[in-house]
Structure formats: C-alpha cells, structure tokens
C-alpha cells in the first residue's frame, strides 16, 4: 500500500511538472512556449497556405518567428520531420505595400522583431531555406508552391 501511494505521488509530481512546459496542443501539433506548430507537407502557394492555416485553428497563421530561440525550435522541428523534400518551407512573413511604402510583417499581425534573411530582394513572400537546414530566410515569389508550417496560440 505504501509503495502504491509513493508511486502515485511520484507520477503526480511528474505530470504536474510537465503540464506547465508548453501549450496544450492537438495531438498532431508540437508546442513551444504558449504556441502550437504543425508542419504541412502539401504544396501550396503562400496565400493558399495562409488560408489553410487560418482554417486549422482559431487565430491560426503561417508560422511567425519572433526570437532566436523560436527560430532554433522551428529549424530543429523541420529538420527532424522534413528529410527528403527538395522544397523550402513557407513562413508567415511577406512584404506589404501600404500606399507608397513597403514593409515586412507577419501574417498574424505581429511585428518583425527578429530577422534572419539570406539576401533581401523585391520578391514578396518568405521561406525557410532547406539548404541551410531551415535556419535562414529568403524571399521568393508568392505564387511558388512549397510545404509550410502553421502556428496558433494554444491553451494553457
């Protein structure tokens, strides 16, 4: 009886310590901090990929990368799960024309506070580069088709 209580208490402690480590995400999604992430291995244009992500979850968008730590998490998740594809991966960054000014912003509306561009050019949408093991960004034409990653704010 004493051993049962001890083991039960130990399992409870482990469960409680793990439950605060990330977001509560659906079973086929990965979590980092308070967000949920899903790799989608379907080829879509940037616009179609963003639409797909918005249909998967409330406030779902193509992934925004807001810090170096998040960039490392995303790159490692992609490297572990995308081994054979020759395609780059859409992220939620795009160039927006606002009147006569252009600015880059994430599809979820968050500001660009972290950047890891290969070379800026006039193309409007951004991918994570397969050749860099998904650690650098490059802008490409939005009409190209790539696989992509979705992100949404999970529940705690």
Swiss-Prot record:
It holds the Pfam family Lectin_C. Belongs to the snaclec family. Heterodimer of subunits alpha and beta; disulfide-linked. The keyword Cell wall biogenesis/degradation does not apply. Weakly agglutinates platelets at high doses by binding to GPIbalpha (GP1BA). Keywords: Disulfide bond, Hemostasis impairing toxin, Platelet aggregation activating toxin, Secreted, Signal, Toxin. Disulfide bonds join 25-36, 53-150, 125-142. It comes from Trimeresurus albolabris. One of its GO terms (cellular component) is extracellular region. Residues 24-151 form the C-type lectin domain. Coiled coil: none annotated. This is Snaclec alboaggregin-B subunit alpha. Expressed by the venom gland. It comes from the Eukaryota. InterPro entries: C-type_lectin-like (IPR001304), C-type_lectin-like/link_sf (IPR016186), C-type_lectin/snaclec_domain (IPR050111), C-type_lectin_CS (IPR018378), CTDL_fold (IPR016187). Monoclonal antibodies to glycoprotein IIb/IIIa, to bovine vWF, and to bovine serum albumin did not show any effect on the binding of AL-B to platelets.
């Amino acid at each position: 009886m004493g051993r049962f209580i001890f083991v039960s208490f130990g399992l409870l402690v482990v469960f409680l310590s793990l439950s605060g480590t990330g977001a509560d995400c659906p079973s086929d999604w990965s979590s980092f901090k308070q967000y949920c992430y899903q790799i989608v291995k379907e080829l879509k244009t940037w616009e179609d990929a963003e639409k797909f992500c918005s249909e998967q979850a409330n406030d779902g968008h193509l992934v925004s990368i807001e810090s170096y730590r998040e960039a490392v998490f995303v790159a490692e998740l992609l490297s572990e799960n995308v081994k054979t594809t020759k395609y780059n991966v859409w992220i939620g960054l795009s160039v927006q024309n606002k009147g006569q000014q252009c600015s880059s912003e994430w599809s979820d509306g968050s500001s660009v506070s972290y950047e890891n561009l290969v070379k800026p050019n006039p193309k409007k949408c951004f991918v994570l580069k397969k050749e860099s093991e998904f650690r650098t960004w490059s802008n490409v034409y939005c009409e190209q088709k790539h696989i992509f990653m979705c992100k949404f704010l999970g529940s705690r």
